[in-house]
Amino acid sequence: ASIRHELHRSRKSIQIRGLDRASPVCRRIKRLFRPGTIACMSSYLAPPVSVVIPVRNEERYLEESVAGVLNQGYPGPMEIILAIAPSTDRTAEIAQDLAVRDDRIRVIDNPDGTTPKALNLGVAVSQYDIIVRVDAHGELGPEYIATAVELLERTGAANVGGIMDAKGRTPFEQAVAVAYTSKLGLGNSAFHQGDAPEGPAETVFLGVFRKADLEAVGGFCPEFDRAQDWELNYRLRQSGREVWFSPNLRVTYRPRSTVKALAKQFFRTGQWRREVMRRHRDSVSLRYVAAPIAVTGITAGTILGLIGVVHAAKGT
């Protein structure tokens, strides 16, 4: 006889009634949420998560990024904390409108304007024990949060993360996206290449953390305007905690849209990675110098390309 079952979803829980423990649905839930602890004849409450998004001048992508979080369909309590830095566009207005439309969204001020301050402020006001870092310039892949929670539970890691999947919309952004995935562009980190197997890593893109582990090492260093993820992951590993990479975690990242914006981003990232190397000498890696090398290459390539266009126009 066929098994009759009902799947009741609400914002806070999944209730599974009459399900065979060997059924595909039950096996899927066991894999995603605390394997071995779910009785499929009763209700299950997925671990609650706090999503923290630093935001500054992101009117172009903010709504899309938040929608990507809300559309995850995560079967547990979730809050989204938008830490808004002083912006020159409609970012603050868009953020407030999003909060009015969905009570899971909270808006806090980040008067200092830096990313580490935004992240620390978000963690400080968060209600839950799992912190999901999201970039307003990015879009989470399907089941990203559920998969990350399962990885935290299964591996015992302090931080889990995956692939930065750069995708551009304009021809320039598309060219930059290709450079991002090149070993000559941003080094051969697993989260740029996506060809590494799951396992321990030096660092990962963004990250899903245990709040207790973040607090134990002092959170994000507020002095690192850039490269704060590299520096934090170094301290997590030095404390005996584990950073875990999985290619099953994928985030679409939108590159900067102009040469000027891209060069500024890479130049500042290169400066701060040098500071990581200065403070933590045993973290030195060729990957840290990939960003300034990439800036030089992109700038030189752009200049040569413009020279070629001019010569072609003149017929020389």
Question: What is each PLM-predicted segment?
Answer:
Residues 221-284:
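Catalytic donor/gating beta->alpha subdomain of glycosyltransferases that bind UDP-sugars
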Residues 84-93, 112, 135-138:
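A conserved acidic beta->alpha catalytic loop
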Residues 143-174, 178, 250, 254:
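Conserved donor NDP-sugar-binding/catalytic core segment of glycosyltransferases
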Residues 162-168, 177-206, 215, 274, ...:
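Short, flexible, basic/aromatic active-site loop/helix in glycosyltransferases
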Residues 131:
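Short aromatic/hydrophobic "clamp" motif used to bind/position activated sugar donors
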Residues 67-77:
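Short, acidic, metal-binding catalytic loop of nucleotide-sugar glycosyltransferases
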Residues 47-50, 79, 231:
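Cell-envelope/extracellular polymer assembly enzymes that use nucleotide-activated donors
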Residues 110-126, 147, 200, 204:
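Glycine-rich, basic loop-to-helix element that forms the pyrophosphate-binding segment
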